[in-house]
Curated annotation (Swiss-Prot):
Binds 1 Ca(2+) ion per subunit. Optimum temperature is 85 degrees Celsius. It is found in: Cytoplasm. InterPro entries: 4-alpha-glucanotransf_C (IPR015261), Alpha_amylase (IPR006046), Glyco_hydro_13_cat_dom (IPR006047), Glyco_hydro_b (IPR013780), Glycoside_hydrolase_SF (IPR017853), O16G_dom_2 (IPR045857). It catalyses: Transfers a segment of a (1->4)-alpha-D-glucan to a new position in an acceptor, which may be glucose or a (1->4)-alpha-D-glucan. This is 4-alpha-glucanotransferase. One of its GO terms (biological process) is oligosaccharide catabolic process. Its main location: cytoplasm. Keywords: Calcium, Carbohydrate metabolism, Cytoplasm, Glycosyltransferase, Metal-binding, Transferase. The lineage of its organism: Bacteria, Thermotogati, Thermotogota, Thermotogae, Thermotogales. It is an enzyme of class 2 (transferase).
């Protein structure tokens, strides 16, 4: 199985306004099939006021610029007709500040007030987030404070209230009825206060629905494993970082340690990736990787157990350094051609934000023999021929050599030997010659 993460606004335009939309996604299906994609993960498509969409103001309507329900259903049908599943990003930890529920709560409606989390006399109003020390409690003009783990524009939902739980289950049922195949659950480890409570929440929430459930649990292995048994698919942040760090530092030790933590002996499918919307792009890691190292990183990604996931544009070597608060740079328009005015091309409305496309576009890279795009297409073809690798076991054959990474992938009588060369010179392992920054599979 091969996944592909898409920021709809930047991917492909279907109505000539320069903004990606559902009709545009239909027009991109032939490319995604050629790339070997089995499912697409669409970042939030619901009504919201932000560019990223994680502050939903209505779970039953879509961003107007993306299209309406008819467009959405037609897009789903087109993907299914071509054998591609659709996974939606569903941020149910909170709503947007302008959601009807929160606006009614602000006006004093006791029913909707209980949909959110409010400070009591015992609340520590100086409580901070663990990852960046930002405040969690936010004041209103009347002196009340509400909880917003992800900022004042994203008030937390109160899942101690069973009505909130049922409201969000209705959203899930509605989307499944429209043909959605699964969900990526944002901030999945933050639904409840403790690990035990959080696991219990998700076990109950998912108990009567089927699909591809992909969880964002950015945490240590124990926490990931506990949730993995429920979700079935877990984003593997550990190995994602260590692939890039190993290639950047030219030392495989850190990757071997990560594989042992995050890929060995799991009863769920780790979903491996090289970048996403919450970090710098692969080609910009630590200031920038050479094209050779980008290719090697992708070779490693596609020769590990688990599900490989491509962040749109990584297959082209798109660049972008993640810096708050302006994180749009990692969500740049996807370059279909060298000419920004051609059909399907998206662009930012502010000309200064549009990056030059030269040498990065699909059009250019399909013609370039040694391009990153053709490199990754070789590996997606390899995975198509070896579906068993998703659940393969990994056996290390060479753990001491920092520039040579050798392992065997095994599953029910089938096996492959993988050799990665992280040096700038040819290396030999058991008679097999491996070119600089290259991979051989035997």
């Amino acid at each position: 199985m091969i996944g592909y993460q898409i920021y709809v606004r930047s991917f492909r335009d279907g109505n000539f306004d320069g903004v990606g939309d559902f009709k545009g996604l239909k027009g991109a299906i032939s490319y995604l099939k050629e790339l070997g994609v089995d499912f697409v993960w669409l970042m939030p498509v619901f009504s919201s006021i932000s560019f990223h969409g994680y502050d939903v103001v209505d779970f039953y309507s879509f961003k107007a610029e993306y299209g309406d329900e008819k467009d959405f259903r037609e897009m789903i049908e087109a993907f299914h007709d071509n054998g591609i599943k659709v996974v939606l990003d569903l941020p149910i930890h909170h709503t947007g500040f302008l959601h009807t529920w929160f606006q009614k709560a602000l006006k004093g409606d006791p029913h909707y007030r209980d949909y959110y989390v409010w400070a009591s006399e015992k609340t520590d109003l100086d409580e901070r987030r663990e990852w960046d020390n930002e405040r969690i409690w936010h004041p209103l003009e009347d002196g009340r404070f509400y909880r917003g783990l992800f900022g004042p524009l994203s008030p937390d939902l109160n899942y101690d209230n069973p009505q909130v739980f049922e409201e969000m289950k209705k959203v899930v049922y509605h989307l499944l009825e429209m043909g959605v195949d699964g969900f990526r659950f944002d901030a999945a480890k933050h639904m409840r206060d403790t690990l035990e409570q959080n696991v219990r929440f998700w076990r109950y929430f998912l108990s009567d629905i089927e699909g591809i459930f992909l969880a964002e649990i950015w945490a240590e292995s124990k926490v990931v494993d506990e949730h993995g048994r429920i979700f079935g698919y877990m984003l593997n942040f550990d190995t994602s970082h260590c692939i890039k760090e190993a290639v950047w530092k030219e030392n495989f030790k850190v990757l071997i340690e990560s594989i042992e933590r995050a890929l060995v002996g799991k009863d769920y499918l780790p979903v491996n990736f090289t970048s996403n919307h919450d970090m710098s792009r692969l080609a910009s890691f630590e200031g920038g990787l050479s094209e050779e190292k980008v290719k090697l990183s992708l070779s490693i990604l596609f020769t590990l157990p688990g599900v490989p996931l491509i962040f749109y544009g990584d297959e082209l070597g798109m660049k972008g350094i993640y810096r708050k608060p302006n994180t749009e740079v990692v969500l740049d328009p996807f370059p279909w051609s060298e000419n920004i005015s051609l059909e399907g091309q998206t662009f930012w409305k502010w000309p200064a934000y549009n990056s030059p496309f030269s040498g990065v576009s699909v059009e250019y890279q399909k013609k370039k023999r040694d391009s990153i795009l053709l490199h990754i297409m070789k590996w997606t073809g390899f995975r198509k021929e070896n579906h068993w690798l998703d659940r393969a076991n990994i056996e290390f054959l060479c753990k001491e050599e920092k520039l040579l990474h050798v392992y065997r992938l095994v599953d029910e009588g089938r096996s492959l030997k993988v050799i990665h060369n992280l040096s700038n010179g040819e290396m030999v392992f058991e008679g097999v010659r491996v070119q600089p920054y290259s991979t051989e599979v035997i």
